[in-house]
Amino acid sequence: TLDLLANDLFGLLDGLELNQVHYIGLSMGGMIGQAAALRDASRFLSLSLCDTSSRIPLEARSAWNDRINLAQGEGMEALVPSTIDRWFSANFQAQRADEVDKVREMIRGTAVNGFCGCAAAIRDLDLTDRLSTIDLPTLLIVGEDDPGTPVSAHEVIRACIENSELVVIP
């Protein structure tokens, strides 16, 4: 769950003897940052949340179950094509094939159990209704063509966190 991942974050901060930090989270890291700030905002000076979301729509949850089942049945290789297409626009894939290849290798190297646990946490993500309680300077960053976490998902977070700014990268 995201609560367990937030626990891991707090454990890391404690282990590094960091009482307060400027937190930067990308994708799932942004989800973890939201969950952690909801639990103990005093640990953060600011949040920077990139290419993330605060809620997975009900209609998208079955897709996460499908990904979990595919990983368990066929391994991570089976997820590579659809993940690349979800994470990168066709234009980016064509222009930056070298970078996309690095991500393909990262996906292939991901442990199935770790993926399945994180995918279940993402599937169950539903923080939007609580975000208005976050009183931290918050920077939201998203690419305008991000197919996985669209600008609209960041606009929802922006509307909920009063002291937030949204930057859309062309």
Locate the predicted segments by residue:
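Active-site loop/oxyanion-hole signature of alpha/beta-hydrolase fold enzymes
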Residues: T1-I24
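Short beta-strand/loop motif that positions the catalytic acidic residue
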Residues: I134, L140-V142, D146
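Catalytic histidine neighborhood in serine/cysteine hydrolases
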Residues: V151-P170
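Conserved alpha/beta-hydrolase "nucleophile elbow" surrounding the catalytic nucleophile
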Residues: V21, G25-G30, G143
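Short, surface-exposed alpha-helical segments at coil->helix boundaries
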Residues: D3, A97-D101, V151-E155
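Conserved alpha/beta-hydrolase catalytic His-Asp/Glu region
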Residues: L58-A63, E74-S132
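Residue in the alpha/beta-hydrolase core beta-strand immediately N-terminal to the catalytic nucleophile
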Residues: H22, L45-S48, S132
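Flexible "cap/lid" loop of the alpha/beta hydrolase fold
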Residues: M31-P81, W87
